[in-house]
Amino acid sequence: MKHFFAIFFMAVTILSCGNAKVKEYKLEVVAEYPHDTDSYTQGLFFDEGQMYESTGQYGLSTFRKVDLQTGKALQRLDFNDDYFVEGSVMFKGNLYVLTWTSRKAFVYDAQTLEYKSTWKYPREGWGLTHDGTHLIASDGSANIYFMDENFAQKRKQLVTLEGRPVRFLNELEYIDGKIWANVYTTDSIVIINPKDGKVTGLIDCTGLLPKSFYEPSTDVLNGIAYDKKTGKIYLTGKNWPRLYEVRLIEKK
């Protein structure tokens, strides 16, 4: 489990957005679904209408093909105890899975989930998505990395909110030409313009999971999935008992 023993600046939640280009949103819950409380969610995405999830922790890391209605795994990969699995995505016929500090990434066949190869990865693995051309990754800093299918870096982009770097970028999702990113340990999601790294939107997810659902194992918000087939957006968190379909409402 990642720990930061420092006072974390809450820039994304407390900065006043004087810039009219930065829109602020709250959430409307459209529907809710069961989510496995053993899932320390690191990656969440849809591919061809099917939901997938990668989960972390040493000795507990998995990749799962998940039934949305029940939250149960239809197919599952379990990883060696040496690996703390992070973000994942399907891209160009392959499944890509990152690890946190092992500096390794795994590639599987997207259809069968059969193992194909292991790659040396140049940084900590955190979030992972794609824009149809490049893999896009975070590493817990304020940077996002654009890579080809062999993890060769093509571009690095600093993410800023009103000129200030936004650190701890975590799980990523590419939605309608923008990158959505969880900001680790906060209830905030930032919407990023991939061309210049500027934050164009702030999503306040405070209270998404009601306190009545909290258990000692309940952890932070992390997990953004966009189903292109339906246009629906889903959010969850680490060891949460629920996954939510949500809609954005712009704050007045």
Regions found by a protein language model. Name each.
Residues G71-V107, L113-G125:
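Blade-loop segments of beta-propeller domains
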Residues A20-D38, L68-L74:
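A short helix->beta-strand "capping" segment at the edge of beta-propeller domains
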Residues V66-G71, D109-L113, D148-A152, N193-G197, ...:
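Short loop/turn segments that connect beta-strands within beta-propeller blades
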Residues A31-Y33, Q75-D81, Q157-P165, G201-E215:
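Surface-exposed loop and turn segments in beta-propeller and other repeat-based domains
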Residues I14-S16:
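C-terminal motif of bacterial Sec signal peptides marking the signal peptidase cleavage site
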Residues T37-E48, D81-K92, Y121-H134, S138, ...:
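Beta-rich, blade/repeat-based domains predominating
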Residues E53-Q57, Y96-S102, A137-S141, A181-T185, ...:
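Conserved beta-strand positions in repeat-built beta-propeller and related beta-rich domains
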